[in-house]
Amino acid sequence: MSQGKIIKVSGPLVLASGMQEANIQDICRVGDLGLIGEIIEMRRDQASIQVYEETSGLGPGEPVITTGSPLSVELGPGLISQMFDGIQRPLERFQTITASDFLVRGVQLPNLDREAKWDFVPGLSVGDAVEAGDVLGTVQETNLVEHRIMVPVGVSGRLANISAGSFTVEETVYEIEQADGSVFKGTLMQKWPVRRGRPFAQKLIPVEPLVTGQRVIDTFFPVTKGGAAAVPGPFGAGKTVVQHQVAKFANVDIVIYVGCGERGNEMTDVLNEFPELIDPTTGQSIMQRTVLIANTSNMPVAAREASIYTGITIAEYFRDMGYSVAIMADSTSRWAEALREMSGRLEEMPGDEGYPAYLGSRIAEYYERAGRVKTLGSTAREGSITAIGAVSPPGGDISEPVTQNTLRIVKVFWGLDAQLAQRRHFPAINWLSSYSLYLDEVGAYIDQHEKIAWAEKVTKAMNILQKESELQEIVRLVGLDSLSEKDRLTMNAAKMIREDYLQQNAFDDVDTYTSFKKQVALLSNILTFDAEANRALELGAYFREIMEGTVELRDRIARSKFIHEDQLGKIQALSQTIEETLHQILAQGGLDNERH
């Protein structure tokens, strides 16, 4: 530990001299209040420190003490269902201790509760050989999450002692005799620096789809477990609702939700909604698998920059246990703005639109920590992190640097469209400009595991929507009546896909989540209707007859998305009704017309 003194304060940036023994990325206690800061630049004996708390009132001459350790998170039981700020301070306990609704400066508080006791059940015996990543035992943290206590990275040897019972996160639970004769005393908790990715044995190709229950995503633009997706869009297009929906219903074990520089009301919504929502696969509250990191727009700017790293490090910890994790960052634009502000105060050469030249590498650094991996340890385990980042380009201009640097790295682009949002089409994901580079892997996985030609259905539906886009140009010029009857059927099929399938009400109890089996049934019915209608047209029926004879049928197809999951048979039975109805129309008028 070394001590220096402040020579300059510029917003969240503090310059201190006499810091020759300090290292870059060291955590410091700044000023008489002992504010938390991190060294981000060293020049001779002067250190530039970004302070994670409000710096008003700090002045030259006040002391700066380094701790000698980097910004780290505490990883152990007590993470799930908790709400932390950007540097992992527990906000609920913070409020209880300070009796204030605001972040009181200089308060030193352990990240994990030191008094809570956890029931540890050993999984190994004394004398067993262990290595980094091996699971020593488990703690049932919530009804949904079994917290696996692992051997820390860099430790291996023979298990000399292991105890069962109730322990706090600081009490010694096991001892490992290492090769050099030293004994490592382990607790339920371990620390890890946030800016360093946790190691793994091997990176694997992600193939299993992340089912979100959102039809437009799961059907046309799927993301895999271990993939990375970006959600850019203008204000009011529904980025946050898309993020919330994925956080609520994704088929993952753990969800990390990082509110980075967004409105406080959005985190309040999460806190109000999540405890009441039931996970469709387990029947438990989804809060029992969620970690919240709140760094709202009125919190210190520097902590925004740390919040993304805090979130991904916690995600890596659960990944190492063998869990599938989804991390939502809302919004990475605010994080990039924090980088821009700190870069400006450091007087660095600005890049495009004032962002630092290293913006692209920082964004890549974050998304590259996602992925499907084979974890460390003697037993084979697989874990994955799916990273989904919202991007808020000013004015919806996706040519700006944050969006462009993000799109270079991620393989899924859910482009939100202001025009769709204005037409009240939600989720407002534009099916013509969005893309997913995981379509082939997901299609092959579903065809193999579900034994249905899913990729073929998706291609057919997308072709109909693309054809509609081409026909709309003609309709605008010369009107709908100028189209051939076949083209008018295509326009009708596209309308059904858009309104009866892609459009989804996040606030309707049934429509908010659609299981994969229900998605297959809904899309199959629309495609069956289109195929049978085209067949009837070829055999002599008129477009007008088909439309007039299927009013009630089309209404039933439209309403089928509001049928409950446990009544899936009703949707599947509709396929037979579609065929019968169109055969009937053909029998009544089609063949007569052909004769005449």
From Swiss-Prot:
InterPro entries: ATP-synt_VA_C, ATP-synth_a_Xtn, ATP_synth_asu-like_sf, ATPase_F1/V1/A1_a/bsu_N, ATPase_F1/V1/A1_a/bsu_N_sf, ATPase_F1/V1/A1_a/bsu_nucl-bd, ATPase_F1/V1_b/a_C, P-loop_NTPase
Listed GO biological process terms: proton motive force-driven plasma membrane ATP synthesis
GO cellular component, one term: proton-transporting ATP synthase complex
Binding site for ATP: G233, P234, F235, G236, A237, G238, K239, T240
Keywords, comma-separated and alphabetical: ATP synthesis, ATP-binding, Hydrogen ion transport, Ion transport, Nucleotide-binding, Translocase, Transport
Coiled-coil regions listed in the entry: none
Pfam families noted in UniProt: ATP-synt_ab, ATP-synt_ab_N, ATP-synt_ab_Xtn, ATP-synt_VA_C
SUPFAM superfamilies: C-terminal domain of alpha and beta subunits of F1 ATP synthase, N-terminal domain of alpha and beta subunits of F1 ATP synthase, P-loop containing nucleoside triphosphate hydrolases
Record EC number: 7.1.2.2
Enzyme class (EC, first level): translocase
Domain of life per record: Bacteria
Gene3D superfamilies to which the protein is assigned, alphabetical: 2.40.30.20, 2.40.50.100, Bovine Mitochondrial F1-atpase, Atp Synthase Beta Chain, Chain D, domain 3 (1.10.1140.10), P-loop containing nucleotide triphosphate hydrolases (3.40.50.300)
Family statement: Belongs to the ATPase alpha/beta chains family.
Protein name (database record): V-type ATP synthase alpha chain
Species in which this protein is naturally found: Streptococcus sanguinis (strain SK36)
